[in-house]
From Swiss-Prot:
InterPro entries: Acetaldehyde_dehydrogenase (IPR003361), Acetylaldehyde_DH_C (IPR015426), NAD(P)-bd_dom_sf (IPR036291), Semialdehyde_DH_NAD-bd (IPR000534). This is Acetaldehyde dehydrogenase. Keywords: Aromatic hydrocarbons catabolism, NAD, Oxidoreductase, Plasmid. It is an enzyme of class 1 (oxidoreductase). Belongs to the acetaldehyde dehydrogenase family. GO terms for molecular function: acetaldehyde dehydrogenase (acetylating) activity; NAD binding. The active site is at residue 131. It comes from the Bacteria. GO terms for biological process: catabolic process. NAD(+) binds at residues 162-170, 273. It comes from Polaromonas naphthalenivorans (strain CJ2).
Length: 304
């Protein structure tokens, strides 16, 4: 039996429940706590049935147990409004916080683009941007590593059913955080993000459009090669990530059209937006866990 790093999840909604399913398959992570605020929530009930410890008292219900239960990594899948306080309390216990809200108080992490550089820095809070960011920023980065991108615009379309109350409350934060990460991680000089919730029935698969305006004429062969290479990187942890059309070149503009099919861990396969977020968070946590297990990373309490 290999040693696993123990984890807690805050937020038993769509994202938290999907993430729990992924963590249970991990070779290096073991989910032991699920934290919510509503004792009747489906997510808490489901976690209890799986034998996971639960609390409906929010993060304050978890803190007293973290040391005894050896929790070293905590995932926050609640809302941007409460994340800073959650993170402060968790960091004070010496645990790493992986933020799946658009709060973005820690540095952005998009695994195929910049995960490696984060792991060596010993950060105590990393932010997973947004589902739209995880799906599209690798494409912006694939273009910007070939030649400068003056402007990057991403449009993420997700099914209404896959957007729970937390996601809906965070729409403004979603657009701000994603646009910021299109610049900081994607490498665009200016970024813009748009999210569309589509109420169609049956629910539509996640679709993403990425437009990059270049400073000079595009090197079509190099950009095409870079995009295909990046798609293979993303597919390592989200197999349902695929290029539907593109790259399409129109003057200095490059456009890429994507679809993201989920694994169907919690919501059906149309909810690729959950998968790309939770798979990226699990991938990030696994990298940190491997460093901890190898003795290369020691987490220390952070007192605000």
């Amino acid at each position: 039996m290999t040693k696993k790093i123990k984890c807690a999840l805050i937020g038993p909604g769509n994202i938290g429940t999907d993430l729990l399913a992924k963590l249970q398959r991990s070779a290096v992570l073991e989910p032991v706590w699920m934290v919510g605020i509503d004792p009747e929530s489906d997510g808490l009930k489901r976690a209890r049935e799986m034998g996971i410890k639960t609390t409906a008292d929010g993060v304050d219900g978890l803190i007293p147990h973290m040391q005894a239960d050896g929790v070293q990594i905590v995932f926050d899948a609640t809302s941007a409004y409460v994340h800073a306080e959650n993170s402060r309390k968790v960091n004070a216990q010496g645990a790493l916080m992986i933020d799946l809200t658009p709060a973005a108080i820690g540095p952005f992490c998009v695994p195929p683009v910049n995960l490696i550089e984060h792991v060596g820095k010993g950060e105590m809070n990393v932010n997973m941007v947004t589902c739209g960011g995880q799906a599209t920023i690798p494409m912006v980065a694939a273009v910007s590593r070939v030649q400068p991108v003056a402007y990057g615009e991403i449009i993420a379309t997700v099914s209404s059913k896959s957007a729970g109350p937390g996601t809906r409350k965070n729409i403004d934060e979603f657009t701000r955080t994603t646009a910021s990460a299109v610049e900081k991680v994607g490498g665009a000089k200016k970024g813009k993000a748009i999210i569309i919730l589509n109420p169609a029935e049956p629910p539509l698969i996640m679709r993403d459009t990425v437009h990059c305006l270049l400073e000079s004429e595009p090197d079509q062969a190099k950009i095409t090669e870079s995009i295909h290479a990046m798609i293979q990187e993303v597919q390592k942890y989200v197999p349902g990530y695929k290029l539907v059309n593109g790259p399409v070149f129109d003057g200095k503009r490059v456009s890429v059209f994507l679809e993201v099919e989920g694994l169907g861990d919690y919501l059906p396969k149309y909810a690729g937006n959950l998968d790309i977020m939770t798979a990226a968070a699990a991938r990030t946590a696994e990298m940190f866990a491997e460093e901890i297990l190898a003795g290369r990373l020691t987490l220390k309490p952070v007192h605000a």
